[in-house]
């Protein structure tokens, strides 16, 4: 805080997002975008062949993020994609893989919300302060809008040990 005075990106350090992902978020801010942003991936391009995963399933309206709902036990099945929720999924649904674009204004929100989080969770040492929770709160209170940017890139990362060979092969092809 105090050192960043322009839009910036927040990502998971152990995931690969593809060049297009960075290009779309860069272009958004270069071309005058002012809202917070998130790059959405297609659910089907983020699943593991070796087990179920958890993803932030997004509701989007007019390119604006409405909600991000953590959805677990996602995996391919004969009838589509199953999950821990009673919903129909076909793989084209937008999901958050934690590629966020923020302006420095986020630091004010994070400071306040993190202090509240610590106070509320003092007895819960395993609780986590999650960016999607912050974003959902800002959207539901109408304090911020989050522009959803789409990418054709395939996400990949090592969720399971068996994913390691696949990721190695993909990285060698770059």
How would you describe each model-predicted region?
Residues 1:
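Short, conserved alpha-helix that lines the donor NDP-sugar binding/gating region
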Residues 8-9:
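Short aromatic/hydrophobic "clamp" motif used to bind/position activated sugar donors
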Residues 5, 33-34, 143-144:
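Short, high-confidence coil segments that cap the C-terminus of an alpha-helix
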Residues 61, 68, 75-174:
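Conserved alpha/beta core of the MobA/IspD/sugar-nucleotide pyrophosphorylase nucleotidyltransferase superfamily
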Residues 13-16:
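The conserved acidic donor/metal-binding loop of glycosyltransferases
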Residues 18-100, 104:
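Conserved core of the sugar-phosphate nucleotidyltransferase
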